[in-house]
Amino acid sequence: MESFATLIQNRRSTRKFTERLLSPEQVQLILRAALMAPSSKRSESWQFVVVEDKEMLARLAACKRNGAAFLEGCALAVVVLGNVMESDVWIEDASVASIYMQLQAEDLGLGSCWCQIRNRETEDETPAGEYVRQLLDIPYQLEVLSIIGFGYKGQERKPFDESRLRWEKVHIGKFSLPEQEGGEA
């Protein structure tokens, strides 16, 4: 395993995948990472629907106006759900589980990409979450946060360029704007 610093620098969104399928062991490791993610008060308010069927992946790719087409080409999609009856911070809990899966995938040499569903719409203005709910028979108390696509990388992207880090977004001690600090960032 490479260092965590290298792992997060190398993890980039992958929207093009090869045709190669994931092994059951790889899928299990990705899901294991999600299930090991921390959650508020250990509520574990998340649920996951695993989709490998190519026809269903193609249908999921139509879940919103833009930004979901890559799902049709991935080997695996994990639909990330949160139980609104179990936790008032289901969004945060499900988000942490999602990034754990993405980091595990990167560690395995796989690509991944987050497809935001919550607060998005299909072409015909149906809420994207409702579209996914109907496709996958998701019960009413579960909200769809996202769909994470996984697969072997069909494109290699350069690691994150550290010169692009926006250190002006970091405030020490208290919030202050650059002009409050004498114009320096």
Residue ranges, per PLM feature:
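Acidic, surface-exposed loops and disordered segments
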Residues: 1-185
